[in-house]
Amino acid sequence: MSAAAQLKSVDYEVFGRVQGVCFRMYTEGEAKKIGVVGWVKNTSKGTVTGQVQGPEEKVNSMKSWLSKVGSPSSRIDRTNFSNEKSISKLEYSNFSIRY
């Protein structure tokens, strides 16, 4: 990673059939493959929420995955992104599933 890479942080919420379809496990796997950190968890209202941090281009790749791909048996209706901002350092050391 070049020193010039701008670090970004963004919160997300995924709507659709995203619980009971291994969405969190696949999200964790994709995040580790891309090289971003943060977390993912199910909400009580049937969505999946979390935060992604990393170099801007990697965060953008993860945003695309969260919007269009997901786990094999999921159905993503929409994904909302919020609180997107530049950060000076990562707040997490890895990507984890929260409960």
Swiss-Prot record:
Its EC number is 3.6.1.7. It catalyses: an acyl phosphate + H2O = a carboxylate + phosphate + H(+). InterPro entries: Acylphosphatase (IPR020456), Acylphosphatase-like_dom (IPR001792), Acylphosphatase-like_dom_sf (IPR036046), Acylphosphatase_CS (IPR017968). Gene3D superfamilies: 3.30.70.100. The active site is at R24, N42. PROSITE patterns: ACYLPHOSPHATASE_1, ACYLPHOSPHATASE_2, ACYLPHOSPHATASE_3. The modification Phosphoserine is found at S93. Residues 9-99 form the Acylphosphatase-like domain. SUPFAM superfamilies: Acylphosphatase/BLUF domain-like (SSF54975). It is an enzyme of class 3 (hydrolase). One of its GO terms (molecular function) is acylphosphatase activity. The modification N-acetylserine is found at S2. Keywords: Acetylation, Hydrolase, Phosphoprotein. Its physiological role is not yet clear. Belongs to the acylphosphatase family. PANTHER family: ACYLPHOSPHATASE (PTHR10029), ACYLPHOSPHATASE-2 (PTHR10029:SF20). This is Acylphosphatase-2. The gene is ACYP2.
